Amino acid sequence: KNGTADHLDIVRAGNEKVLRARLADANFFYEEDLKEPLAEKVPALKKVVFQENLGTVYDKVERLGVLAEFLGKVLNAGEQDLKYARRAAYLAKADLVTNMVYEFPELQGYMGREYAERTGEEKAVALAIYEHYLPRFAGDDLPSSLPGQILSISDKIDNITGCFAIGIQPSGSQDPYALRRQALGICHIILEGQFDLSLEHLVEAAYRCYEGKVELKLSLEKVQEDIAEFFKQRLKGIFSDRGFSYDTVDAVLAPGFQNFSDTLLRVQALADFRQDPAFDDLLTVYTRANNLAKKATAFRPDPSLLQESSEEKLYQAL
């Protein structure tokens, strides 16, 4: 309320009236939604557009199932976790067609978890349904369960790959599909879980799910290249936030990257080595050799001039 403190009882009564009405609506939606199991709502997703050029949300659910299977095997998930991930992938988007989420979109995921538990799904499945939206914003919780991690990565890489494949990429301040946030989410989940996961293979798996079903504007190779660069920029920010110097990070990422956890280990290794007194000596030697190499003219070595066996072995090795 703006203004004076006069007539607060009237203001309170008005607010309570509005709040009671909204709570009554929410209770009605909740009871209506529970009249059928969450799984029975999935076919209705065939009528919900995911993205105008990428099919329906039901199509996305099918892709999530394929990606969850792929990731589960790559990450060596046990059969039980893989079972939970498969089921959660099928149910992940079902709450989008519930009365509650239609009226309160910000409750997606929350209601999926609640309805899954209330209609007999395993708690691990319900948790994964909720966790697949995590992290929702910077500093948010990460998925705590392996099925949740699998489903979260699957959901986000599907969004990113699909958008890139039809030519939709963030530019400047424009990022209508929140692809930067989703890429950061993938990075944090993989790094936190220390997963041995190749971005190249992950993007290929996601791309293959679209192939032959929608019209893609870019080739797999181009999409992999663009997404690798996109993720490289996200990793630069993450490593910088962890206290690594920009030149250390740039040096490691300069040749490109594919494996998230391996890249972090290399950044840490280089940062540690830079504290070693031998690093400066090595850098001096390399700089001199590099400068000489820039000035050198091209030539072909003549193996007939080699005299020592060690020279011949070195020549063969090179």
What are these regions (language model features)?
Residues 1-318:
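Amphipathic alpha-helical "coupling" segments that flank catalytic cores
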